[in-house]
C-alpha cells in the first residue's frame, strides 16, 4: 500500500505524458527501469517541457526513451491520469518537488522494426525492453502505477483489438 504523508499530499503533480506504443502485432512496448534493483517494468513516459504541447512531448519522449520516433499518434487520452509515488521515493525524484505525476496518455502505432529501437540513449531509462500483451502489461507493471495503467488500458482497449 502506498502511504503518502500529509506533507507529501500538499505537493503538486508533475505534468507529463505516457505512451502506449503498439507494434504491428498490437503488442505494447515495455522497458525495465535501469535505476532500480527490483524488476520495475513500465511504458515510456516523461515530463512536459514548458511551452510544449502534450503530443509534441510524447513524440520527443518516445525518441529519448526508445531511440526512435518511427510512429504516429492514434489517440490521446480524454483526461489527465495521475499517480502518487511512495513517500520514500519523493525526496529522490524531481528534487522532492512533486508527489507524483499527472499524465496525458497517447496510443502510438510504432512503424519501425525492432532494429530501430535503441534503449542505449543519451540518458537511458531502461536496461531491457520487450513487447507485451495487455494481460502481461498489467501483471508486470510496478505496483504503484497499476491503477493508472488499468484506466489507460480501459480507455484505449477498443482501439487495440
UniProtKB/Swiss-Prot annotation:
GO CC terms: cytoplasm
Motif Nudix box, residue range(s) on this chain: 46-67
GO molecular function, one term: mRNA 5'-diphosphatase activity
Swiss-Prot/TrEMBL keywords: Hydrolase
Record bears the keyword Iron-sulfur: no
Domain Nudix hydrolase: start-end pairs: 12-154
Highest taxon of source: Bacteria
Cofactor: a divalent metal cation
Family (UniProt): Belongs to the Nudix hydrolase family. RppH subfamily.
PANTHER family: M7GPPPN-MRNA HYDROLASE (PTHR23114:SF17)
Role: Accelerates the degradation of transcripts by removing pyrophosphate from the 5'-end of triphosphorylated RNA, leading to a more labile monophosphorylated state that can stimulate subsequent ribonuclease cleavage.
Protein name in UniProt: RNA pyrophosphohydrolase
Amino acid at each position: 500500500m502506498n502511504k503518502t504523508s500529509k506533507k507529501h499530499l500538499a505537493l503538486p503533480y508533475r505534468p507529463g505524458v505516457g505512451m502506449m506504443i503498439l507494434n504491428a502485432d498490437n503488442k505494447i512496448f515495455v522497458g525495465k527501469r535501469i535505476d532500480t534493483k527490483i524488476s520495475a517494468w513500465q511504458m515510456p513516459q516523461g515530463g512536459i517541457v514548458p511551452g510544449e504541447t502534450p503530443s509534441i512531448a510524447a513524440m520527443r519522449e518516445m525518441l529519448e526513451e526508445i531511440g526512435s520516433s518511427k510512429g504516429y499518434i492514434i489517440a490521446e487520452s480524454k483526461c489527465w491520469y495521475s499517480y502518487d509515488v511512495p513517500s520514500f521515493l519523493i525526496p529522490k525524484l524531481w528534487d522532492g518537488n512533486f508527489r507524483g505525476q499527472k499524465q496525458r496518455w497517447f496510443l502510438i502505432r510504432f512503424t519501425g522494426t525492432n532494429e530501430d529501437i535503441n534503449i542505449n540513449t543519451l540518458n537511458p531509462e531502461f536496461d531491457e525492453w520487450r513487447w507485451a500483451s495487455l494481460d502481461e502489461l498489467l501483471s508486470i507493471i510496478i505496483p504503484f502505477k497499476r491503477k493508472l495503467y488499468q484506466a489507460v488500458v480501459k480507455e484505449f482497449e477498443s482501439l487495440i483489438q
